[in-house]
């Protein structure tokens, strides 16, 4: 059984490590730059998406919506952080890898779109007021469930609605900047 002084020493060490890590973490003042660069980042996402938008919207033969009002409601509500985080992960890990399988030109543009989305996610994480979350979003689970059921058509649906996703990102981040 370790002595109480050894345990105390370990606790002091861990507290010091945590304090030094927190000191090197970006502060709220560093988020000011993010708030200023967000419109440009969203514009770059929209421009990158415009290069594949027609391809995926022409292939999307479904009348139903994948990105529904309930997802936007989650973005606007207390689950906004988690919904945004999960949707970025969903597009990066499930949708875009499948979307890249439609020829070299499409792959190049989808890859560029994915890189821009990864950059946005990284900047959101650095500014903790935008992504301080851990709960699960039921609306995101619904999107993933419908996407899976649609199989190949799910890729067309999800990619054809990527502009809606960008709008939801903008709604969420604009709301967070006002808080």
Curated annotation (Swiss-Prot):
Which UniProt keywords are listed? Answer: Cytokine, Disulfide bond, Glycoprotein, Secreted, Signal
- Return the SMART domains for the record: IL10 (SM00188)
User: At which residues is glycosylation annotated?
Assistant: 135
Q: Which GO-annotated molecular functions does the record name?
A: cytokine activity; interleukin-10 receptor binding
Q: Which domain of life is it from?
A: Eukaryota
SUPFAM superfamilies, sorted = 4-helical cytokines
Which PANTHER family does its entry note?
Answer: INTERLEUKIN-10 (PTHR48482:SF5), INTERLEUKIN-19-RELATED (PTHR48482)
Subunit composition and interactions: Homodimer. Interacts with IL10RA and IL10RB.
What is the name listed in the Swiss-Prot or TrEMBL entry for this protein? Interleukin-10
């Amino acid at each position: 059984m370790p002595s109480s002084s050894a345990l105390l020493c370990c606790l002091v060490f861990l507290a010091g490590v945590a304090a030094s890590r927190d000191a090197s973490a970006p502060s709220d003042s560093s988020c000011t730059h993010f708030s200023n660069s967000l419109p440009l980042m969203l514009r770059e996402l929209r421009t990158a998406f415009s290069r594949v938008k027609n391809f995926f919207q022409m292939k999307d033969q479904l009348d139903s919506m994948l990105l529904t009002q309930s997802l936007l409601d989650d973005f606007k509500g207390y689950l906004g952080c988690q919904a945004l985080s999960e949707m970025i992960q969903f597009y990066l890990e499930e949708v875009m890898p499948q979307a890249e399988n439609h020829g070299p030109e499409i792959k190049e543009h989808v890859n560029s779109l994915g890189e821009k989305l990864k950059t946005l996610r990284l900047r959101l994480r650095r500014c903790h007021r935008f992504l301080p979350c851990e709960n699960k979003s039921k609306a995101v689970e619904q999107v993933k469930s419908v996407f899976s059921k649609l199989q190949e058509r799910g890729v067309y649906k999800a990619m054809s609605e990527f502009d809606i996703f960008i709008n939801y990102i903008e709604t969420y981040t604009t709301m967070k900047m006002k808080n």
